[in-house]
Amino acid sequence: MSEIIEVIYEDGVLKPLKPLKIKGKKRLKIKIVNDDVEEFLKSMIIKKCKDIDYKKLKEAYYESF
């Protein structure tokens, strides 16, 4: 299962902004994406098109790393 979540880095710990559906002591891999990337995606001119699934576009972008 893959999921994109938002976190805040505070006191040396990444803290999710919403509850996670993960069992305790589960080992995961985390991809760190800076907010600058989010701002870039939001500012893209393509975003003005109505027929684009932006959730899928965003997920495809993150999966490319």
Curated annotation (Swiss-Prot):
It comes from the Archaea. It holds the Pfam family AF2212-like. Keywords: Plasmid, Toxin-antitoxin system. The keyword Methyltransferase does not apply. InterPro entries: AF2212-like (IPR008203), AF2212-like_dom_sf (IPR024069). Belongs to the UPF0165 family. Possibly the antitoxin component of a type II toxin-antitoxin (TA) system. This is Putative antitoxin MJECL31. It comes from Methanocaldococcus jannaschii (strain ATCC 43067 / DSM 2661 / JAL-1 / JCM 10045 / NBRC 100440) (Methanococcus jannaschii). The lineage of its organism: Archaea, Methanobacteriati, Methanobacteriota, Methanomada group, Methanococci.
